[in-house]
Every structure is written in C-alpha cells, then in structure tokens.
Amino acid sequence: MSSANQANRGEGLTLRQAALIAGFSYLLMPVTFAEFYVFPKLLVPGNIEQTAQNIAAHGRLFFVAILCHFITLTLDVIIAWALYALLAPVNRSLSLLTAWFRLVYTAVALSGLLNLVTVFRLLHTPDYLTLFGAQQLHAQVKLLLSSFRYDFSMGLVIFGIHLALLGYLIFNSSYIPRILGILLSLLGIGWIIYCLGPYLYPTAPLGFIPLAGFGELLFPLWLVIRGWKIPSGLQVRLFNTADLACSRSSKRRTDSSRRSTPVEGISGSAE
C-alpha cells in the first residue's frame, strides 16, 4: 500500500455522518434545563440576599446547572468540527472561519461560566462568610452573576457572526434547504442586534429576539431527520495528509538525486 493511501486511511468523514453528528449534538444540549428550570428557581431578580440563600440551600441543583452549561459548551466544540466537515465542500476556508467563530464563542462563554463556579465556592465555603461578612459576600455574588451574563452576552455577538456565516454557507450548498440558511443568517443578525442594542439603542424593544432563537432548532431537526439522506458518496478529508505525504516523498527523492549528482567545482579541484 502506498504512503498516500496509508495517510488517507481513517480520515474520511461523509457528509451524512457529519450531519448526524452535528444534529444529535445540538439536540443533546442540556443548557435549556439550566436556563428555564434551575436559574428561574434560584435566581431572584432584584433580591441578591434571597438569591444567595437559594444557591446556598440548593447547591447541588446550582452545580447541576453549571455542569449543564459545561456539557453544552463541550458539545459546541463537536458541532464546530462536524459543521466544518459538513460545509467544507461549499467553501473550505469560509467553513473553517465559521468553525473558528463558534470555538471563540465557546471560549468566551466558558470564561463567563467560571464566574458561576466562583459563586458556588463563595456560598459553600464557610470561611468566606466569616472573612467577608454577609453584605460584602452578597455584593461579590451579585457582581459575579452579572459578569456571567455580560460575558455570555458578548459571546452571543460572536455566536451571531457564526450563525450568519453558517447561513451563508448553507444557502450556497446544494444538499441543505436554502430556507434554513436564510433563517440562520437572520437569527445571527438578530443575536448581534439583541446583545449590542442595549448599548447603542437602550429604548429599542428587542425582547422578542430570544424567542426567535427557538427557530434555530429547525436546523438540527433537519440534520437528524433528513441528514441521513445526504448522498453517502460525498466525503471530506479533514486534513490533507495524503498530499502532504506525497509532497514529503517527492522532496526526499529530490534530495536524494541532488546528493547523487556530482558538483562540477568539487570534482574539478579533486582532479
């Protein structure tokens, strides 16, 4: 077997496989449990004392919410990889850029998640209450919870750019409905406006935009329900190591031929 064939073994990922991996990873995200069950139960708007008491009394539930966010961000990395493979045939460089935007969003969101970890530690370590006192401790908890939301909001700006580029790639593909591309691009622009709007236009009514975010679920549903119908013959090499192996082999042959060719100046002086 040639070195090029050896280098290419195990690297192929069909578009069908990439679609199913991305779709199931989307649907397995547990962040909705944290955002729509745990946080409304524990976080009381405008009452940091009650919020701190709730987190202290239900520490395990609060930690589960943190874990849900962490699992979701881990799945985001898998989705970035799968979507890159799925859309590389459309435009490999733009697909790579789109994946990088999702990875950067994941990193920003993960840094924000660390604020919740600090909140958990502050409220479940008795020494901190003795050291800071209740009032100062509650002030720190309030600051950390606000920082989590602000960091996550800035991450959503980057996520919006990712969705806009993703929609463009889908619109220009021949194996995913164009309407999904239009929808994702509009959602991406919507997230950017929603996150930056309070700073640019504080009075603008933008509260409806997060509800439109549920439209993003149409994409993973299509990937799971219809993605298996994408022709399996379409395959992507994620890393072009076959060409790299051929290039290295050619370079070795060139170097070998150079060493075997006598240099005229040296042979003449030897005579």
What feature does the model see in each segment?
Residues L200-Y201, S269-E271:
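Glycine-centered secondary-structure boundary/capping sites
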Residues S257, T261-A270:
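Short, intrinsically disordered C-terminal tails of secreted or membrane-associated proteins
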Residues M1-R248:
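Hydrophobic, aromatic-enriched alpha-helical segments typical of multi-pass transmembrane helices
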Residues R248, R252-R253, R258-R259:
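Basic polycationic patches enriched in arginine
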